[in-house]
From Swiss-Prot:
Sequence-specific transcription factor which is part of a developmental regulatory system that provides cells with specific positional identities on the anterior-posterior axis. This is Homeobox protein Hox-B5a. One of its GO terms (molecular function) is DNA-binding transcription factor activity, RNA polymerase II-specific. Residues 128-155 have a biased composition (Low complexity).
Length: 319
């Protein structure tokens, strides 16, 4: 659960088997006022004294009979595979207890699936908590070294103690980035609101929404595909070349044929006819006007050469 950080007992304390831990997950008399005593008070500084846990009805209060100072330590049986949260939340509902009870060799993914399974009644966990989940691969261990009196715990029971809703306020953002990533991969990428680690929330995306967003980004990164029918038949918008001069217009075979037919009937066009041809051939009026000017110059040049060629042999026969 939230506020119970995922701190491996065996990783933090190499001589973990030396400590005598009661398995609160077992169905024994330890549930009704069982005590937790540490056999090595000299080395384990934050778990000294005896603790009594009274479970009567929906009362989830923790009675601390210790007179010393320091942080509270609530540690379930790490080596026995029990779970304190399973007993604290599911003592009135066997389905909840079964869903929270995990073997010692469970993985993070299976633990997350059991916590989010519908068999846990109306228990709402994890998705609305503001701190990392308390499942750990390899054990049902729950350790809290930063639980103080200012922790906000709101419990509401329903259905004869069948479901409880607990919301914890995170007091210490001591979880590492690797634990966050493993937790995200375990429970399907559901966004967990975090106040201290906002960048962790940004990395989480929903399944369908994340896939759709990825596809959108990929489509935006690729240039749009241009089909042949999307291209114009000519280049009319770019009138300047690389050297600042007007770009040479490349007329298509159809455009040239239509212009030649029009020039054959009318060497000079009116403005109205020029607009009609421009719309019919997808050209501008300026291009039509320039083409007719060039065509008239070529026609005059051809006529001049033809007249000169006809006049030269005639002059040779003159006396």
């Amino acid at each position: 659960m939230s506020s119970y950080f995922v701190n491996s007992f065996s990783g933090r304390y190499p001589n973990g088997p030396d400590y005598q831990l009661l398995n609160y997950g077992a169905s024994s008399g330890a549930l009704n006022g069982g005590t937790y005593r540490d056999s090595s008070t000299a080395t384990m500084h934050h778990a000294t004294g005896s603790y009594g846990y009274t479970y009567n009805g929906m009362d989830l209060t923790v009675n601390n009979r210790r007179g010393g100072s320091g942080d509270d330590a609530v540690t379930s049986g790490h080596f026995g595979g029990g779970s304190l949260v399973g007993d604290a939340l599911g003592f009135g509902s066997p389905t909840t207890e079964r869903s929270f009870r995990q073997p010692s060799s469970c993985s993070l993914a299976s633990a997350a699936e059991s916590l989010l399974s519908p068999g846990s009644g109306d228990t709402s966990l994890g998705a609305r908590s503001s701190s990392p989940r308390s499942e750990q691969s390899g054990s049902g261990n729950l350790s809290s070294t930063n639980l103080s009196s200012s922790t906000n715990i709101s419990s509401s029971g329903g259905g004869g103690g069948g479901g409880t809703v607990q919301r914890f306020t995170e007091l210490d953002d001591a979880s590492t980035e690797s634990e966050e990533l493993r937790r995200d991969n375990g429970h399907g990428g559901n966004p967990v609101p975090r106040t201290g680690h906002s960048h962790g929330v940004q990395k989480q995306e929903g399944g369908p929404a994340g896939a759709a967003a990825g596809n959108t980004v990929g489509s935006e990164g690729q240039p749009p595909q241009i089909f042949p029918w999307m291209r114009k038949l000519h280049i009319s918008h770019d009138m300047t070349g690389p050297d600042g001069k007007r770009a040479r217009t490349a007329y298509t075979r159809y455009q040239t044929l239509e212009l030649e037919k029009e020039f054959h009937f009318n060497r000079y066009l009116t403005r109205r006819r020029r607009i009609e041809i421009a719309h019919a051939l997808c050209l501008t009026e300026r291009q039509i006007k320039i083409w007719f000017q060039n065509r008239r110059m070529k026609w005059k040049k051809d006529n001049k050469l033809k007249s000169m060629s006809l006049a030269t042999p005639g002059s040779a026969f003159q006396p």
